[in-house]
């Protein structure tokens, strides 16, 4: 799935690139790669506690000791396992009810969908960064993979 692709891409990022800054955004490559896994963490925490999904949790920075691509990928593997366990546990549940978020109420289904496409966009960005770093990757998420999602063909925000 998406998180598996993310982990495989993150593992390939050279550690000496993690401090580089993203185009048109004051965010390091390290922070972006952590963030793409923090998005489902925030969703899962909301699911587990019933508390409001906050912006602060969504953009929480990586721990200071998470300084290698391998460490970020390990975090990603843990998130993937937690997400898969949640998906198994909630299979067949009603997702039409409202859940509390920092941007107002939305349905559980819409929040899950938003979590998936938000992470997907950042995975596309990591793929682009790997290309900039001249790292070969077998498969990137392309335009054909995102059809039907509320994403543009643009990978980066414009200045």
Predicted regions span which residues?
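Short, contiguous alpha-helical
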Residues: 7, 16-62, 97-159
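Amphipathic terminal alpha-helices
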Residues: 83-86, 147
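A short, structured beta-strand-centered segment in the mid-to-C-terminal lobe
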Residues: 64-79
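Hydrophobic alpha-helical packing residues
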Residues: 6, 79-83, 126
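Short secondary-structure junctions
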Residues: 10-15, 90-91
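Catalytic cores of extracellular degradative/oxidative enzymes
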Residues: 64, 85-99
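Active-site-adjacent scaffolding segments
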Residues: 1-11
């Amino acid at each position: 799935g998406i998180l598996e692709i993310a982990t495989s891409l993150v593992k390939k990022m050279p550690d000496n690139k993690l401090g580089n800054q993203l185009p048109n955004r004051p965010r390091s490559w390290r922070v972006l790669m952590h963030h793409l896994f923090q998005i489902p963490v925030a969703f899962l925490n909301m699911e587990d506690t019933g508390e409001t999904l906050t912006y602060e949790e969504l953009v929480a920075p990586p721990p200071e000791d998470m300084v290698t691509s391998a460490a970020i990928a390990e975090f990603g593997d843990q998130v993937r396992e937690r997400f898969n366990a949640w998906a198994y546990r909630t299979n067949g549940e009603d997702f039409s009810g409202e859940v509390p978020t920092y941007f107002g109420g939305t349905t559980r289904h819409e929040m899950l969908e938003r979590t998936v496409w938000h992470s997907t966009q950042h995975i596309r960005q990591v793929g682009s960064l790997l290309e900039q770093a001249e790292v070969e990757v077998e498969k990137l998420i392309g335009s054909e993979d995102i059809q039907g999602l509320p994403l543009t063909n643009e990978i980066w925000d414009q200045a």
